[in-house]
Each structure stands twice: as C-alpha cells, then as structure tokens.
Amino acid sequence: MVIDRKNLFIGSSLRTNKYSIEKTADILFKQKVVERVTLIEIPKHPNCIHLDTLFTQISKTDFVYYQPFMSTGLKITQYRGDLDHQVTYSGIHQLMYEIQPMVRLIPCGNAKYPYAEREQYASGCNFVALKNSVAVSYARNLKTLEALKERGYQIISAGELLNGIKTGLIDPEKLQDTIVTVRSSELTRAGGGPHCLTLPLVRE
C-alpha cells in the first residue's frame, strides 16, 4: 500500500510472508523507489487476508481502519533505506502520527458494537481513492459511512455521481470530501472490496 512518495506499507498475513516482504523491500531500496518500507504483521485470521481488509487510505490525512485489530498488539517493523536499519512501533497510531501529524483514523462501523465486526467482514475498511479525499466504498456498510459523514464527507451513489457529471451539476475536478458508494450484493459473494478490485498503475 503506497502511503506517499516515501512510504510503502505491506501486511504480513496468511497470504504474504515476511521473507517475501523483505526481498521486495531490498529490491525497492536498491532501485531507490521508496525510502521506507513498513511491515505490519496483521492477525492470522480468515477475515484479514491482506492489509486492505483492515486499513485503507482515502485522503492524504484520512484512513479507515478496523479498531479491534489495529489499535494494539500489532508487531510493526519499519525498514529505513535498507534491511539493517529498523524501527519498531507499538501500534498503528504511533506509526501514522509520525508519518502524518494531521492524520485522522476513522473506525470501521463507527466503532460501534456489533457493527464494526460485521462491516469489517463486509469490506468496510476496503476503500479505493480516486483522488485526494474522494473514494469508493460499498453502500452496505452504513455505520462506516456514518462515521465518514460525521467527519465532513458527503455520501453519494455512483449513479448520482454519473448523472451529476452528465448534467453538469458535478464537476469531477472540483469534487472533494466525497465517498462514492457502489452496490455490492454480487461483488461480495467472492469476497473483497473496491480496493481489492482495482490495480492503480500510475499515481501522483
């Protein structure tokens, strides 16, 4: 997960092991692609296949995360420039505040029981950013959308967005602080969310 020009996060999970991450980091450092690679050892749990099932970025400062798994007890190792220079962190908060002092960590399910667990299972943390502060989410995760609305985001459906662009009521270049929702009844049958379904090839 590319956080910014300097930082890359990779989750070590049931599907991604530490050896592969360190080999990747070594190649990236030698080619001077990034300055820091952060290895986050996420729980070995079937609901946590990859890092983006627990944590995704929607703006330069805002991230949606699953609080029960990401707040405490994580083993986080950051490699700085090479594999010999390492820094460890006690949790995602400590790590993120160092990278981005203005960070806002927005809880999946609005940190409400039992919605947080249900919505994490339904890809409630899994957003894909179209641009800074404009991201796509499943429409079904209502409490997560509620948390975003409370923090100043407007929620519109993909249909509303497309109609607004077509009629000239919405200028996509000026769009900001917006979550675009898509229906998920068929997509969720195979698992994964909007971030899982995309592969950015070029990012600013």
Predicted feature locations:
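The feature marks the mature, well-folded catalytic cores of soluble enzymes
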Residues: 1-204
